[in-house]
Amino acid sequence: MKSRLFIISQYLLPHHLLSRLAGCVAECRARWFKNAFTAWFAKRYQVNMSEALVEDLSAYEHFNAFFTRALKPGARPLDETPGAILCPADGAVSQLGPIEHGRIFQAKGHGYSALELLGGDPALAAPFMGGEFATIYLSPKDYHRVHMPLAGTLREMVYVPGRLFSVNQTTAENVPELFARNERVVCLFDTERGPMAVVLVGAMIVASIETVWAGLVTPPKRELKTFRYDEASRAPIHLEKGAELGRFKLGSTAIVLFGPEQVKWAESLGAGSAVRMGEMLAVPAQA
């Protein structure tokens, strides 16, 4: 009954209004408020500040600065296995596996369209049909920067407007097409394993999504917008394996997609597996 009421509330609540209000709270610089709220949050979610570059909670100018905190050098060593594809973020594996008939598995019989996830462009989605996906959920206590699984050159970024349902196990099991309905940013790279998509999915009270090349990704009008980076007039944007790609200001989910016969997921991973950025996520499926 409790879960059902929660799901009903997800359809009734004003997602974007609540998220804008949360964004204002998270950017508040009043010392008495930001210090008290940050301390409460760190204690409530048992945030490990010993690995943070700045351990003093009161040193952060606002809550968002704390939430997107940098880590000390070496806190997330990169797996050195030759050809390893790295986990892009701290969190837990929600699901991973093949993209079958253009569908990505969500939970308990729910799936969603890879085409819709990527913004509805058949040409952009085509290389991933029959490929592989991995969905990583970032919890409140996690490090909320997203990094490159492989070295890649940015080809395209797509902002896809949408709802802002909460993202957790309950909504994954009860909200159809959850990740293809929520607001998201699709980042498409060319890599040694072919096209790679990293999708940053928003959620309720996720105030914003940033990338290292574009900053805050919030078009003036909430409509689908494509940014191309492979034009001759632009200097190429190349990111090395393990380099920061973007960050969540109040996190959510990162989804990584590869084409067919390109990667094989690490045998130790499955739904529910705890992961850290820089650990092995997959290996090449072929030499």
Curated annotation (Swiss-Prot):
GO molecular function: phosphatidylserine decarboxylase activity
GO cellular component: plasma membrane
BP terms from Gene Ontology: phosphatidylethanolamine biosynthetic process
Catalysed conversion reaction: a 1,2-diacyl-sn-glycero-3-phospho-L-serine + H(+) = a 1,2-diacyl-sn-glycero-3-phosphoethanolamine + CO2
Cofactor(s) the protein requires to work: pyruvate
Metabolic or biological pathway, per its Swiss-Prot or TrEMBL entry: Phospholipid metabolism; phosphatidylethanolamine biosynthesis; phosphatidylethanolamine from CDP-diacylglycerol: step 2/2
Record's bilayer topology term: Peripheral membrane protein
Site keyed Cleavage (non-hydrolytic): positions: 251-252
Primary subcellular site in the record, as a coarse category: membrane
Active-site residue list: 90, 147, 252
EC number of this enzyme: 4.1.1.65
Post-translational modification as stated in the protein's UniProt record: Is synthesized initially as an inactive proenzyme. Formation of the active enzyme involves a self-maturation process in which the active site pyruvoyl group is generated from an internal serine residue via an autocatalytic post-translational modification. Two non-identical subunits are generated from the proenzyme in this reaction, and the pyruvate is formed at the N-terminus of the alpha chain, which is derived from the carboxyl end of the proenzyme.
Free-text comment on the cofactor: Binds 1 pyruvoyl group covalently per subunit.
Modified residues (Pyruvic acid (Ser)): 252
Biological function: Catalyzes the formation of phosphatidylethanolamine (PtdEtn) from phosphatidylserine (PtdSer).
Full protein name: Phosphatidylserine decarboxylase proenzyme
Species of the source: Pseudomonas entomophila (strain L48)
